[in-house]
């Protein structure tokens, strides 16, 4: 009798665990995944009033998720189109409050906010995005991003209403520390338009790289080892009038921008930046062949030990120093 009682108690205690294990195993079976995909898409469509389609969902052990062929349609607009999303996360570190991301990749994404957001419309396409992160510590608010790559991405922002919104006075302290080891951009552009004053801003980056960047959001400390951007253009236009001859502040068109910076950091009054290279051309004919130098500051002084500017027709050397109250600037004569 006692053995039978122990047996029944054991079954009662083990049944929820067994059911949970069976459920988890079922999630990895393709027919079950296909059924859940259809049911989830149908439920989401009914709840949102939109047409939501998902061509394929594939979950592989332990946490490797592949989603293909996602469409979100609110006639006549397609709000979201996604060719593929792949998320590969290690399972065991999650039980320790850590996130180890082997790979997150997005391919061929198109977004159109239509009228979902008051006062603005966002449209864009994303060609490819990849992220690898080993060292996200949720309890201690630390994130290490080993690699992030973004390419063939173009975003348009149209602001229909520039009325200022009430400022949110609620404050929450952000304590995260972010360590970005490597970031690469290729063929990325952004444009913004404010119809109220006909202001248009557009920027295109052909290639950009950031290495060893750090951000301590609690203490407001920032730094990076190197930054390089090339093949960049920036356009700024206000009004509908044709650009005036020469330099026109209402119509600025910079092209062939190349910027190289090293050893940058910002910690309150402690700042440093090495300008390794800078060059650009403007629509008006203004051209900077080269700009190199260094900027340095601490609790006592702000100093430009050397800054050299070269244009096609002139050269200028600059040194400057200030003690936050008094300044001494020396500029050599152009040659």
PLM features: residue spans?
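N-terminal type II signal-anchor transmembrane helix
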Residues: 1-49
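Transmembrane beta-strand segments that form the barrel wall of outer-membrane beta-barrel proteins
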Residues: 275-278, 301-307
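Flexible beta-edge/linker motif
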Residues: 56-160, 172-195, 204, 211-237, ...
């Amino acid at each position: 009798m006692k053995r039978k009682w122990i047996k029944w108690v054991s079954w009662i205690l083990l049944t929820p665990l067994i059911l949970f294990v069976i459920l988890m195993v079922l999630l990895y079976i393709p027919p079950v995944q296909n059924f859940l995909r259809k049911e989830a898409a149908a439920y989401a469509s009914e709840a949102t009033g939109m047409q939501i389609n998902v061509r394929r969902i594939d979950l592989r052990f332990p946490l490797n998720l592949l989603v293909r062929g996602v469409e979100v349609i609110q006639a006549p607009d397609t709000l979201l189109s996604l060719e593929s999303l792949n998320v590969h996360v290690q399972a065991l570190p999650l039980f320790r409050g850590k996130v180890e991301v082997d790979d997150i990749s997005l391919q061929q994404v198109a977004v159109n906010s239509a009228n979902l957001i008051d006062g603005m419309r966002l449209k864009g396409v994303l060609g490819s995005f990849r992220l690898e992160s080993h060292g996200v510590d949720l309890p201690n608010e630390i994130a290490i991003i080993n690699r992030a790559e973004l390419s063939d991405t173009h975003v348009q922002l149209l602001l229909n209403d520039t009325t200022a919104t009430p400022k949110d006075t609620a404050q929450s302290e952000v304590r995260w520390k972010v360590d970005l080891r490597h970031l690469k951009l290729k063929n990325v552009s952004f444009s913004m338009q404010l119809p109220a004053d006909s202001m248009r801003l557009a920027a295109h980056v052909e290639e950009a790289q950031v290495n060893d960047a750090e951000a301590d959001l609690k203490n407001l400390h920032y730094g990076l080892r190197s930054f390089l951007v090339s093949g960049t253009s920036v356009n700024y236009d206000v009004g509908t009038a044709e650009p005036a001859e020469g330099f026109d502040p209402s119509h600025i068109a910079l092209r062939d921008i190349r910027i190289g910076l090293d050893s940058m950091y910002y910690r309150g009054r402690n700042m440093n930046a090495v300008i390794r290279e800078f060059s650009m051309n403007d629509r008006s004919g203004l051209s900077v062949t080269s700009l190199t130098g260094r900027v340095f500051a601490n609790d006592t002084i702000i100093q430009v030990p050397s800054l050299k500017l070269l244009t096609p027709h002139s050269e200028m050397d600059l040194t400057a120093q200030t003690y936050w109250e008094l300044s001494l600037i020396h500029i050599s004569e152009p040659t």
